[in-house]
Amino acid sequence: MNFEIYNEEIDHKLEAYDYCLDESLIAGKPSKVRHESRLMIVRDSSLKEDYSTNKYTKDLLAELREGDLVVINDTKVMKARLKVELENGQLVELLVLEKSDQSTWLCLAKPAKKLKINKQLNLKSPFAKDIKLKISGIDDETGGRFIKFPENINDLISMNKLLDIFGEIPIPPYIKSSEEESFHENSYQTEYACNPGAVAAPTAGLHLSKSLISNLKKKGILVMPITLHVGYGTFKPIDQEDLSDLKLHKEWVSVSKKVVEEIKRIKKTDRRVIAIGTTSVRALESCYSYAMKDFIPIAKYVDLVIKPGYKFKAVDGLLTNFHLPKSSLLLLVSAMIGRERLLDLYKKATKEKFRFFSYGDAMYISPDSFLEK
């Protein structure tokens, strides 16, 4: 089938990224074995068999070649959901997003209207002494609240220690699950997570088991980590119809010199860079300096928007999940293979009962399927 590659007038409209999905296809729990989730493999659109659906994530091994570089995001999801008490005893919920200043942190609040400036909050736990918090302001961009924590809660390390005592894993609201909190503490975390700072999982990485990673390495495939602390920029719903000037909330990214040097070497050969998840894509593409026309190591906040019309510099292939309608992640994947083709593949995935979203199945976008770079 011939698909329109890029139409700026249509592809920059949010409505063009909507699709229908039966709620029964939203995964409430992951596959029992990580690498046995189903896998749709997307191939060159000119081929008669331009995609495969009878595969599993473990079959990614056969798709990759010796010398390829697989990039994983090693961020770790914090127990960033806090239940706090107002002065009248009413419970409200906070989602800790990021540090703002000193010991002040930006948090999403639910219900937000209850949290007025200068109000006191009480953080309780049966395992520790109560902690007093104060609302110091309202963030115009997110609608969140600036919350003043004790003075010693002034970096990610100290905040993560507090959250380990008082917090819960922030499972997305569309995951309807009767499982205990301890289940999600394991299943909503990649097996290689080691850098606390995320408030949502880099979900493509949930498909990678230790044995699959070991088999990749045995085949001569390099596996290297970057860090992108998944935050509001990844999961915030897009609230504007015109996408031509779309902006995303910043997220912390760290890509080492070692990874950058390997990418530079690969770009001089026929080897490929395969990203595990859209967060890895954003991190790697943020390494490209248009001023220097080269890749550079970074450790900073980034707000890169990838949408149709974007020309990829670093990434050649992608393992990803099936994403929410009208999401920034859907825009990113559309930039790789075209919006029309992606939505057609999603339609086929629904007919074949693939499972969607965070705990769902996976899609491998092969290098041959990419639009011309």
From Swiss-Prot:
EC annotation from Swiss-Prot or TrEMBL: 2.4.99.17
Molecular function as annotated in GO: S-adenosylmethionine:tRNA ribosyltransferase-isomerase activity
Pfam family membership, one: Queuosine_synth
GO cellular component, one term: cytoplasm
Compartments, as annotated in UniProt: Cytoplasm
InterPro entries the UniProt entry points to: QueA, QueA_dom1, QueA_dom2, QueA_sf
Record-linked SUPFAM superfamilies: QueA-like
Pathway(s) served: tRNA modification; tRNA-queuosine biosynthesis
Gene Ontology BP annotations: queuosine biosynthetic process; tRNA wobble guanine modification
Reactions this protein catalyses: 7-aminomethyl-7-carbaguanosine(34) in tRNA + S-adenosyl-L-methionine = epoxyqueuosine(34) in tRNA + adenine + L-methionine + 2 H(+)
This protein's UniProt keywords: Cytoplasm, Queuosine biosynthesis, S-adenosyl-L-methionine, Transferase
Main location: cytoplasm
Similarity comment text for this entry: Belongs to the QueA family.
Subunit and partners: Monomer.
Purpose: Transfers and isomerizes the ribose moiety from AdoMet to the 7-aminomethyl group of 7-deazaguanine (preQ1-tRNA) to give epoxyqueuosine (oQ-tRNA).
Name assigned to this protein: S-adenosylmethionine:tRNA ribosyltransferase-isomerase
Native organism: Prochlorococcus marinus (strain MIT 9515)
This protein's encoding gene: queA
